[in-house]
Amino acid sequence: TSVVVTTGGGSSAPFNVTLASVAPTITLALGSTSEGLFYTLKNVQVTPTSLANPGDTLSLYATGLGDTTPAAPVSGVATSTLPLSPLPTVTVGGQSATVLFAGIPSGFASLYQINFVVPKNVQGNVPVVVSIGGQSSNSVTLPLFGISAVVNGASFLNTGTAAPEELISIFANGLGNKDQDFDFPSTTVQGVSVTINGIPAPVTALAASGSQINLVTPSNLPTTGTVQVQLTTPSGTSVDFPLIMNAAVPGIFLVADPSNPTAQIAVAQFANTVWLAMPTSTAVALQIPQNCTASNANPLSICGQPAAPGDTLVLYATGLGEVTPNGDPNGTPLGTGVVAPANASTLYETTATTTVTVGGIAAKVLFAGVAPGTSGEYQVDFQVPTGVTEGDAVPLKVSLPGSSTAAATLAVHSR
């Protein structure tokens, strides 16, 4: 079928379209490219600041759902409610929702309303899809109270797994609007708390404006199986969010490069300095001094340069698993919310063997454990091996038995 638009005495060129009995499309919220237009039974629009809850009955609006009974008028608005039969299906977060009504309401023209019940086991920002006649609609986002994702606090990878004593970030709706940068080891900040298998988790930061809360997983969690994460805020308590536990889920902290947003540069300092190992271009983009060694820079002043074979670096990570004094497998693990001694009077090292590879070549690991004065933040001291193929983005990986990091990068150049 061809469509021609005529206006002001002129006509457009024909535009070919394919007609189908159904072509479901969910209406988007005004100004959004992803959020659907949803309303509660009280005709309140659902938005990121006015959330719906699991179990709520909501309405969405869509086009292209096909014939009603009786049929809709060819032109003008419906003068009575025109129901659809059979009903479309609605999935919310991959779960089937109960559809209570679908049709064109009285006073509407070609715009369908679907009333449905949000499944009780979904939460956070979830996708919604309408299907009818073998066709599925666009996927839109429904903002619900609760947790959207739990990610590694260093790499921000969403693997659905975590380890005891790991820094994690939870992205969730309903955290309020007040940020609090650091209140460790408090387990409640601005009325927001998280439990994992019923154990309160120490909070490191609440970024409510970014829908994010950072915390350290309790050290006495199991290292296998699934645990349940539950969020409590002044608005209520979320449904359980499942999280698979492993002995280690390592993740490397990364440097943000303004000149290369996709870069995966590891946070690694030169030993006994605050200099950072990075490409010269990254140091320039960050507007920090370069050529630290050649310029004899102050070791306590920020500076950036590539590492060289033989250099000793301090890499920062999380999720390396159980730590005890000197890595003694029979020692007492660092407790939940306990900070490793800042004066390094006792070094809490990983009980599992930690390995580092640079460009696929094994590096000599000098220390792997919780950084003194921290909890959940690990440091790995290692020497850059010789024989590495040099470059600005040499693959760097940390591994423990049964797990390893996604490959970060390290700039390596001889000097």
List where the protein language model places each region.
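A sequence-level detector for low-complexity, Ser/Thr- and acidic-rich stretches
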Residues: T1-R415
